[in-house]
From Swiss-Prot:
Gene3D superfamilies: 3.30.300.20, Ribosomal protein S3, C-terminal domain
GO BP: any one term: translation
The species this protein was found in: Aster yellows witches'-broom phytoplasma (strain AYWB)
GO CC terms of this entry: cytosolic small ribosomal subunit
Database matches in PANTHER family: 30S/40S RIBOSOMAL PROTEIN S3, SMALL RIBOSOMAL SUBUNIT PROTEIN US3C
One GO MF term attached to the UniProt entry: mRNA binding
Name of the gene: rpsC
The protein's name in its UniProt record: Small ribosomal subunit protein uS3
Role of this protein: Binds the lower part of the 30S subunit head. Binds mRNA in the 70S ribosome, positioning it for translation.
Keywords: Ribonucleoprotein, Ribosomal protein, RNA-binding, rRNA-binding
């Protein structure tokens, strides 16, 4: 089951929490879900090159129903803040116009972007669109993540790889990625790369460690030194779709 499902959704309520947090009446739920979708779409379109990894939306206090707290996690906070906060103020104005509510915008810096699955996948997509060879793209991403301290990394690219007539899937993995272990902190992302040969699908799994009793997901994502990069006996694993000698990538 862990091989089929989205690792982020599978761990919600166990070791992960929701990115939208609010308590309202049943009649208000559809409108707020749509509003959250439009808020995230506006922020991502407004700051496309700011490497946004996560957007948290909170409406927790009943006394402040007309107030929304938005936390943007980004590897490039200066792009969103701008000179003297001008860019941030423009974004807040657009959000107020969209929601017709008071908006409190927090910009949080992602200290190590090489261990964030979404940022890694976006970086891989950008390189593929610039016609870099797909195997090199995967190996570079895995090496950076392991060097940054990830305990396990797995990548998968699907589509017309290298301009081939028949689409296939090919992936690489290094370290442990225990998808069936619910206490395992696994960061997952899936993005698309639009190339001249068509659309390529990119999936990335990052294993940060196990969340033990009394710990939170923040404990496993602290910066730690990579011990695996100094192990000469470790060999990366490769797998290709449609080849009986390897793991079937489509089932992963």
């Amino acid at each position: 089951m862990g091989q089929k499902t989205n690792p982020n959704g599978l761990r919600l309520g166990i070791i992960r929490t929701w990115e939208s947090q609010w308590c309202v009446n049943d009649k208000e739920i559809p409108n707020l879900i749509k509003e959250d979708f439009l808020i995230r779409k506006l922020i991502n379109n407004f700051a496309k090159k700011s490497a946004i990894s996560q957007i948290d939306i909170e409406r927790l206090k009943e006394k402040n129903k007309n107030r929304i707290t938005i936390s943007v996690h980004t590897a490039k906070p200066g792009v969103i803040i701008g000179k003297d906060g001008d860019t941030r103020n423009k974004l807040v104005a657009k959000l107020k116009e969209l929601t017709q509510k008071d908006v409190n915008l927090n910009v949080l810096e992602v200290k190590n972007s090489d261990k964030v699955a979404l940022l890694i996948a976006q970086n891989m997509a950008e390189k593929l669109e610039n016609r870099m060879f797909f195997r090199r793209v995967q190996k570079m991403a895995i090496q950076k993540a392991i060097k940054a301290g990830a305990k396990g990394v797995k990548t998968l690219i699907s589509g017309r790889l290298g301009g081939a007539e028949i689409a296939r899937s090919e992936g690489h993995a290094e370290g442990r990625v225990p998808l069936h272990t619910l206490r395992a902190d696994i960061d997952y992302a899936a993005v698309e790369a639009h190339t001249t040969y068509g659309v390529l699908g990119i999936k990335v799994w990052i294993f940060h460690g196990e969340v033990l009793p009394g710990q939170t997901i923040l404990d496993t994502r602290k910066l730690f030194a990579s011990q695996s990069s100094n192990n000469p006996n470790r060999r990366p694993r490769n797998f290709k779709g449609g080849n009986n000698n390897h793991v079937n990538a489509k089932k992963n």
